[in-house]
């Protein structure tokens, strides 16, 4: 069973998931668990998101136009997926595997590297994106689906 490790009111930073999969993976670069306890994996080599239930049973996949690198899921059950080769972030419904929106960074020297979540059981969680732009490493926050760069 996928299980988020948290004490009520504490931030959630990880989970314990011990399962064996009988699936032909490329290269898994990101993992997150939805509010429905489904496991979402980024397969960088095969350009897809994979969905498994909490027992490790394959449910579905979403083919993508390029390689997904990382994923984080907000308290509102929205998955944010970074796709560095397209310089974009996808918002995905993690349980239905459908793309809700796509944010593209137009600056030619921008590299989207990672996404992470800071979740709380008592307040809305924050999603952060790490990226390099113009030679500078930066972080941006996503609040209610809007990317905020300070």
Regions found by a protein language model. Give the residues of each.
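Conserved beta-strand position repeated once per blade in WD40 beta-propeller domains
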Residues: 30, 70, 112-114
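Asp-box/WD-like beta-propeller blade repeats and closely related beta-sheet repeat scaffolds
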Residues: 88-126, 131
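Conserved beta-propeller blade signature
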Residues: 38-40, 78-81, 126-130
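A short helix->beta-strand "capping" segment at the edge of beta-propeller domains
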Residues: 1-27, 53-57
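Structural motif
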Residues: 47-50, 86-91, 135-146
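Residue-level detector of Asp-centered blade-edge/turn motifs that repeat once per structural unit
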Residues: 33-36, 73-77, 116-124
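Surface loop/turn motifs at the tips and blade-to-blade linkers of beta-strand repeat domains
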Residues: 20-24, 61-65, 102-108
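Blade-loop segments of beta-propeller domains
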Residues: 53-89, 98
